[in-house]
Amino acid sequence: NHNPVPIIKPEDYELNFFINTKFINKFTLEDLKKMKSKKVITTIQCGGNRRGEFDKTSGTQWGIGAISTAEWEGIPLCNLLENYNAKYIHFEGYDGVKSSIPFKKGRNCFGDVLVAYKMNGVELPRDHGYPVRVIVPGYVGIRNIKWIQEIILEDEEIDSSWQKGIAYKILPGSIRCLEDVSKINLDDIDTINELP
């Protein structure tokens, strides 16, 4: 987790849905549980997994422990997006963490993106996003926002350090130290989304 784990009572939970700044809808936990659900087994991996095995990297020096596989259950995000269009889907958690994915990933029902409320057949543990989180199979862990509070459709990537910061960019091999980063425009560098 990037920030402290929020304490959210299930009866107080709300997921707000916006297009740009226009409010579209609000879902309670009970609303979500009444919708048709789907189960997906996927592996989530932190973008920094095994970072400690590289030379001179910043950030937590992870070994191989920032990865796990689980069965998730929730609402296919594509079902919530049926009548909409955009370039990006922004996610914001109750903990303040913000990230985005391309709209085509979330809108594709074969992409298995979920608004999930169960993990391995039981309600989500608090550390894994209770009561609701986003699951984006095949994407770096930071795109799988926990404690999801808002889904916003936009035409630009979200402007957050977890999306546009150097930790989540595919930097060219010529970048050997932090001072070298000032020589490039980070907006021209691809954001890490998919993992092998």
Q: Where in the sequence are the language-model features?
A:
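Extended, aromatic/histidine-rich regions of cofactor-dependent oxidoreductases associated
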Residues: N1-N16, N20-F27, S37, E82-P196
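A glycine-rich, hydrophobic loop/mini-helix early in the fold
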Residues: I8-K9, E14-W62
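Short alpha-helical interface elements
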Residues: T57, E71, L77, D159, ...
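Mid-length scaffold segments of soluble, non-membrane domains
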Residues: I64-K87
